[in-house]
């Protein structure tokens, strides 16, 4: 009868271990201005002394069971499970990795930003040729998917989270300021 107990305990212990591994815990996904990415259990705090790669482009509040999207200049959103991004307990840029290498994208493609892929996420984006588009929670369940059709020679140059009451501002290469209502 002791064999029956041990055979019942082993699967239960394995199931508990799997639940612990997949616990949905809060985390932050950090994309630096220099193209490094990491997952941290704590938010970055201002440092008295600057470090290499410490300028933050995007900070996404997420959880280990959520997905994050990385939008690239070719108009593709790359879906990544937060738990797949290398983690550090305390925010430490030295533990980050190159986001382009992590995503496996080409050298001529730039990562423009990291975004939560939730039902209330709205992303405003603009292209080199002046196309402005808002993407409202139409996130396909694929690992990578197009979010905008680009004409030959065009590319995304900027993207940011947006709401209806935001104003979109673009600065052209000849220093003109272009303003659009987000809605």
Predicted features and spans:
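Short, structured "edge-of-domain" segments at secondary-structure transitions
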Residues: 1-183
């Amino acid at each position: 009868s002791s064999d029956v107990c041990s055979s019942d305990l082993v699967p239960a212990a394995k199931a508990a271990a799997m639940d612990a591994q997949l616990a949905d815990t809060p985390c932050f996904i950090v994309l630096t201005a220099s193209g490094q990415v990491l997952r941290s259990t704590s938010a970055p705090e201002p440092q008295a002394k600057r470090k290499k790669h410490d300028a933050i482009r995007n900070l996404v509040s997420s959880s280990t069971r959520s997905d994050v999207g990385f939008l690239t200049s070719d108009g593709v959103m790359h879906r990544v499970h937060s738990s797949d991004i290398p983690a550090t307990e305390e925010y430490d840029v030295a533990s980050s990795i190159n986001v382009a290498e992590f995503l496996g994208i080409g050298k001529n493609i730039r990562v423009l930003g990291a975004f939560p892929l939730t039902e209330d996420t709205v992303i405003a984006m603009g292209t080199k040729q002046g196309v402005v588009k808002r993407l409202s929670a139409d996130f396909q369940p694929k690992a990578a998917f197009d979010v905008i059709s680009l004409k030959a020679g065009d590319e995304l140059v900027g993207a940011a989270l947006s709401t209806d009451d935001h104003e979109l501002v673009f600065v052209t290469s000849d220093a003109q300021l272009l303003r659009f209502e987000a809605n």
